[in-house]
Amino acid sequence: MKAAWPLLLCIALLPEPSSSLAQSEDLATKSQRAKEFMAEGKFAEAIPLYSELNHALPNNPGLLLNLGMALHMAGDERKSIPQLEAAVKLDPKLGPAWLFLGAARLQLGDALEAVEPLRAVLRLQPDHQEARLMLAGALLSLERNAEAAQEYRKLADLSPASSPAWYGLGRSYEALSIRAFHQLEKTAPESAYWLALVAEARLRQQQFTSAFYLYRRALENSPAMLGLHEAVAEIYRQTGHPDWASVEEEKERKLSPPDCHSHTFECDFQEGHFERVIAAATEANPEESYYWRSRAYNELALNAFARLGQMPPSAEQHEIKAHIYSSQKKYIEAAEEWRQALKFSPGDRQIREQLAISLKFSQDYGGALLLFQDLLRTDPESTQLNYLVGDTLLELQRVEEATPFLRQVVARDPKSQAAHKSLARAYLAAGKSADAIPHLKAALATDEDGSLHYELGRAYQAHGQLALARQMLSQYQEIHSKQEAEKQSLNQEMQITPPDER
């Protein structure tokens, strides 16, 4: 928002009523000087002048707007909001005041409160692209993904060359696809529909063995489900078994084709009528509905991202690549894409945070820490950033420095299991097993490999609570043994084997 200030100044620097300013040559001089400061980007210098003008001429919506705008552009969002609220109260048709009010609330992370001011701008000026982009972003951050998609779609129609519009549209559709998948997972976990979606995702990530295993399980559940044999054939082709692929293709051909006269999901999907699939899926049974909606939204997302890829280089293109690399756990490559994105948007906090996270996951803890600390300086109340700084310091074995940050996070958000886990690690590293115990207990629900049960058992031992120690260590053994058995079973099952004779 702030990067676009020259454009917005053209809208927002409204002339104050000449009759008022004519009362005093001094006020007119101050007004002119304040405008010059704003045009030069010297927002802090303009603030005292606009404050004096507002004191001399109270309840002037134009002056309130300009003071609020100067405060916003100088980075003082909290002080800008009352001025902008007063301006729109006096003049509800003052579009620029609504715009800056929405922008200020977004800067403070209050997306919910930003929505109505931005909608007010669009009621006054429906083709205002900056307002629509901010509104769409606010809705997406609130997980109101269908509404966000509508706004991004309108923006893409207004400006087909807008990279942010296509990127946002793709992200909205992607979120809708994921939501439909999670609804399917709740409704029918382990169903053929669910297995097929997970397998499709693994195949896109070139995890061929895992995808093969899941497609085979889906076929066991639903042998007549269209597309499964063809997907298995694709895995065979990708892994160097063209003869096996031919067998699976023949099995697919023997299945009864869909009756396309009745507009089946399969036919509409194959013909690229994804909106029709989504609309029709609302009338289907839940399993089928969630399956087809997830697939259709995913295709719409891919189409939007493909459109983005055809445009000149942009931050959004690098963000897409960074997310893909992250999903593949290629964090060094992801970090490089975030660096490239940052060249297009040097002040973008979200990009800087994502770069730091990628650096952390790639074990460049020193580089990550510098970025996290810099972000925290401008947002010291952020629970997320305090946690990331503390956890990164812990990875660097700077335990004494890490502990205060992690304590602060746990105090603010007692339900944060990640923070409890990190704080427990810090206490254990410092030899404070008694202090670690309550935090290990709070984080036990996240223990996938038994390590937290083991650490808690050791902490109980050190603290002399031997019965509890035996209980925790016994549970650790159970978890560990079960996990090893499952791992061995999966290793046997997850092999790319020849086609069944059936």
Model-derived segments and spans:
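Register position in tetratricopeptide repeats
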Residues: A39-E40, M73-A74, Q107-L108, S141-L142, ...
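Canonical positions in the second alpha-helix
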Residues: E52-L53, A86-A87, A120-V121, K154-L155, ...
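TPR/TPR-like (Sel1-like) alpha-helical repeat modules
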Residues: L155-D157, Y167-A175, T187, E230, ...
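Structural marker of alpha-solenoid helical repeat scaffolds
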Residues: A56, L90, L124, L158, ...
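Helix-start (N-cap) detector for alpha-helical repeat units in TPR-like alpha-solenoids
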Residues: L27, P61-G62, G95-P96, Q129-E130, ...
